Swiss-Prot record:
SUPFAM superfamilies recorded: Phosphoenolpyruvate/pyruvate domain (SSF51621)
Active site: 185 (proton acceptor)
Family statement drawn from the similarity comment of this UniProt entry: Belongs to the PanB family.
The species this protein was found in: Prochlorococcus marinus (strain AS9601)
Name listed for the protein in its UniProt record: 3-methyl-2-oxobutanoate hydroxymethyltransferase
Keyword line: Cytoplasm, Magnesium, Metal-binding, Pantothenate biosynthesis, Transferase
Enzyme Commission code: 2.1.2.11
Cofactor section: Mg(2+)
């Protein structure tokens, strides 16, 4: 799977499904579930490493976990899902040269075929443009951008007219820069629909309604493994309680033997 395949999926109106993964087991499960894209997201800082936000995640962390995820794949190379790695906080906000160096390390050192970059501010636009010119595919990410939570919080974006116009303009700019896809997070459904219909690249939603070209979810949220669930992700099972109860049964039974 290559980034260009997702663009072709949109042309064919084929829904794109993505999940996050953080180790070989979650990577293997995602592959066996037949997802199109596996995102090694900076959410692993909280899901896997116990941090309270995505900000502490390092470049070394993302490289380590991206390789772990890929080792879980068992299908033929051409049948494996596309792997996209998040660029951690301060690996692309530090100037074009450093961003190229850090993104290059991710692509060179892992099986990732693209990186995801949050935001569309003028300085981020320059970074994205440079990365793409250097041959590194980029997935954009606008709306709620968790790496900016200290400034904007974690509230829903695009609820005012000004905010909606800003997000629409950012999406258009990201396509013009050459992004192969854009993640829209926690914005109104109809805004996502308007953006999707105005662009030729696929729009992947998370908390952006069902009109998008595809959906991505944090696997741990979907499986109910986290104590704090985002408002836009309804768990399909209460995984944490299920595993806890079953393990407690085993512990109690072993104590009686």
């Amino acid at each position: 799977m290559l980034p260009s395949d997702l663009v072709n999926y949109k042309k064919k109106s084929r829904k794109i499904i993505a999940l996050t993964a953080w180790d070989s087991i979650s990577g293997s499960i995602a592959e066996q579930a037949n997802v199109d894209l596996v995102l090694v997201g900076d959410s692993l800082a909280m899901v896997c490493l116990g941090y309270k936000s995505t900000l502490p995640l390092t470049l070394e962390n993302i490289i380590y976990h991206t390789n772990a995820v890929s080792r879980g794949f068992k299908k033929k190379i051409e049948e494996q899902p596309l792997v996209v790695s998040d660029m951690p906080f301060l690996t692309y906000q530090c100037g074009e040269d450093k961003a190229v160096e850090y993104a290059g390390k991710i692509i060179q050192s892992t099986y990732a075929k693209a990186v995801k970059v949050e935001g569309a501010e003028p300085e981020i636009q320059k970074v994205i443009s440079r990365l793409i010119r250097m041959g590194i595919p980029v997935m954009g990410h606008i709306g709620l951008t968790p790496q900016s939570y200290l400034n904007i919080g974690l509230r829903k974006q695009g609820e005012s007219l000004a905010s909606q116009e800003k997000i629409k303009k950012e999406a258009s700019i990201l396509e013009e820069l050459g992004c192969f896809s854009i993640v829209l997070e926690h914005i109104p459904d109809l805004l996502a629909k308007e953006i999707k219909n105005s662009l030729t690249i696929p729009i992947i939603g998370i908390g952006a309604g069902n009109y998008c070209d595809g959906q991505v979810r944090v696997t741990a949220d979907l499986l109910g493994l986290n104590d704090d669930q985002p408002p836009f992700c309804q768990p399909i099972i209460q995984g944490k309680k299920l595993f806890k109860d079953k393990l407690k049964e085993w512990v109690d039974s072993e104590r009686l033997n």
